Amino acid sequence: MDVRQQDVERIVVEVLKKMMSDQPTAAATTVVAASGCDCGDFGLFDRLEDAVQAAEAAQKKISTVAMRDKIIAAIRKAGLENAKAFAEIAHNETGMGRVSDKIAKNILVCERTPGTECLSPMAISGDMGLTLIENAPWGVIASVTPSTNPTATVINNAISMIAGGNSVIFAPHPNAKRASQTAIQVLNKAIIEATGVANLLVAVKEPTIEVAQELFSHPRIKLLVVTGGEAVVAQARKVATMRLIAAGAGNPPVVVDETANIARAARSIYDGASFDNNIICADEKEIIAVDSIADQLKAEMKAIGAVEISLEQADAVARVVLRNYPQVEGGKAPNPNPKWVGRDAALIAKAAGIDVPDSCRLLIVDVKRDINHVFARVEQLMPVIPLLRAANVDEAIEWALILERGLSHTAGMHSRNIDNMDKMARAMNTSLFVKNGPHLAALGAGGEGWTTMTISTPTGEGVTCARSFVRLRRCCVVDNFRIV
């Protein structure tokens, strides 16, 4: 067992010991679990069937909004209390990101994920009577979670899906299973203490391909939610037999035109592109600056702490962090080496033979007008960002469209020209479009609106919340129940 794995086990043991040492409240004296099955280890089961059965039984116990509100309050409290421990487990298990930023993500989803308050029924009255449209649960939702946000996604999905009256069976990424499973156990403990309802959140102890395939076609699961990259989304689309909500990859460009507040743009891009080592899919992945202000933008970013590397050094970095690079004729396209996804900028630089301060959070490379540069074309999920120089804002927007690859995920612009911002927003047609701020602002971190870790672009739900995880049911009363 390596040092990192030892750290994971140590922190998990500490969290679980604290869980077990806390005395349950009176509400937990009667635990509602599935009868006739393995009741699990605070939501963890050996067999998929037992997990599904337990989740089905739990879901039937949360029909009232008052109960859901109580459960969500318990989840928020437990998530905040364990934000640091969850972050440490995730970082030590995956090696990705930064503990401080993962703490911030965990806090954000606890505080800014909406609950039942975002669900409202609709009534339609007219000469022929009254029709009521209400939000009904799906039942048991299957949620596939990523290694990039293994605890924040569990917390966020748990709040949103329970708000809609559902229970959840999670399928954590195998490389982050301890982090996700620990979060599931801690949240279940909090729910039990608050309400006595067990197994609203469940998972199979050993996630395997076989378990995932069985989950994707399980007859008693009617909704599958996949938060992850292109590969897992593509696989889910091929085999899923139920409705699918999919959050896929992006390659978000940010354009800076000549009217922008350059200092503000530099700070926003630096903060966004370096946050958690750029593993959030909405983070800025390439900068397209109008040439007349490109040097000033670089200078401002370097003054904050970004380190500029040369094209030759960027080539050395690419050889370290990308597979199939340089690409041979007829060979596979370059793609990120998982070993380096989400690693610190200083570690990446030193592996490529480049001396940078240990405090370095972001590497920047000026690729001039090379829109085919590998760092512009490939989404690395690393704190390495290319800067391209466009002749004018129209060319910058044109390049942004090319580099975003039609994924319709996220894009941004720094400008004080309303026409330019309007033009780019319309052209990009992305689920998230950010003006004059870091891209994370669109997820409630420094901007208005709610937070999610499941940005569903491929299937169209966008920034998900409880409304995304309900079925609309209609009840029609003919000729009666109108008061006018």
Curated annotation (Swiss-Prot):
Pfam family name, one: Aldedh
GO biological process, one term: alkanesulfonate catabolic process
Keyword Oxidoreductase: yes
EC identifiers of the protein: 1.2.1.10
A GO MF label: acetaldehyde dehydrogenase (acetylating) activity
Function per UniProt: Involved in an anaerobic respiration pathway that converts the sulfonate taurine (2-aminoethanesulfonate) to ammonia, acetate and sulfide. Catalyzes the oxidation of acetaldehyde to acetyl-CoA in the presence of CoASH and NAD(+). Highly prefers NAD(+) over NADP(+).
Miscellaneous remark of the record: Taurine is an abundant dietary and host-derived molecule whose metabolism to hydrogen sulfide (H2S) by members of the human gut microbiota has many prominent connections to host health and disease. The human gut bacterium and opportunistic pathogen Bilophila wadsworthia produces H2S when respiring sulfite (HSO3-) released from organosulfonate substrates such as taurine and isethionate.
Protein name: Acetaldehyde dehydrogenase (acetylating)
Organism: Bilophila wadsworthia (strain 3_1_6)
Gene this chain is encoded by: adhE
